[in-house]
């Protein structure tokens, strides 16, 4: 029987275009340092991570350009919607990510922003390489063909 305090993982924001625009090599789960009004605003489900990315500054990884709108009930202690947010990772993970970005020309992009079973805000971060236009077209052709194949199989019975 499940614990009373255990909650399911609840995805609050997802970057759907990331899998189309990037070839994803590896994913990693990172904590994210937030203020109280940011957590409440994310729980309202209005945040977006579609045009955001992660970057390294002074040996730390920061989430840049993620939009978490102001919490409506928050008064003068509200947060700035597009401020850089620190990602919480182990030193070994940070070194691995910085190495991939610096040496191999990879990009760090967020895939999902969610609350885990313990109610903590987490970010699924991907180490990815940008796709060229012809790669995107190829991905689209494969997707269309698999859709068409499914239709044909359903039609045949």
From Swiss-Prot:
Domain of life: Bacteria
Region (Disordered): 133-157
Keyword entries, A-Z: Cytoplasm, RNA-binding
GO cellular component, one term: cytosol
Cell compartments where the protein resides: Cytoplasm
Positions with biased composition (Basic and acidic residues): 135-151
Gene3D superfamilies linked: 2.40.280.10
GO terms classed as biological process: trans-translation
GO MF, any single term: RNA binding
Residues making up the signal peptide according to the UniProt record: none
CDD domains listed in its UniProt record: SmpB
Function: Required for rescue of stalled ribosomes mediated by trans-translation. Binds to transfer-messenger RNA (tmRNA), required for stable association of tmRNA with ribosomes. tmRNA and SmpB together mimic tRNA shape, replacing the anticodon stem-loop with SmpB. tmRNA is encoded by the ssrA gene; the 2 termini fold to resemble tRNA(Ala) and it encodes a 'tag peptide', a short internal open reading frame. During trans-translation Ala-aminoacylated tmRNA acts like a tRNA, entering the A-site of stalled ribosomes, displacing the stalled mRNA.
Similarity field: Belongs to the SmpB family.
Cross-referenced PANTHER family: SSRA-BINDING PROTEIN (PTHR30308:SF2), TMRNA-BINDING COMPONENT OF TRANS-TRANSLATION TAGGING COMPLEX (PTHR30308)
Protein name, per record: SsrA-binding protein
Gene transcribed to yield this protein: smpB
């Amino acid at each position: 029987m499940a614990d009373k305090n255990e909650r399911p993982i609840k995805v609050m924001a997802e970057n759907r275009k990331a899998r189309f625009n990037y070839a994803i090599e590896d994913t990693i789960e990172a904590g994210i340092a937030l203020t109280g009004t940011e957590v409440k605003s994310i729980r309202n489900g209005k945040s977006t991570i579609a045009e955001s990315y992660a970057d390294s500054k002074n040996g730390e990884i920061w989430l840049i350009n993620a939009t978490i709108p102001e919490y409506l009930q928050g008064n003068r202690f509200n947060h700035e919607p597009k401020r850089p947010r620190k990602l919480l990772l182990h030193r070994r993970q940070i070194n691995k990510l910085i190495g991939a970005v610096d040496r191999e020309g990879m990009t760090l992009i967020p895939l999902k922003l969610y609350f885990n079973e313990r109610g903590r805000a987490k970010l699924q971060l991907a180490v990815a390489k940008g796709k060229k236009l012809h790669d995107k077209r190829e991905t689209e052709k494969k997707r269309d063909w698999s859709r068409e194949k499914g239709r044909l199989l359903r039609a045949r019975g």
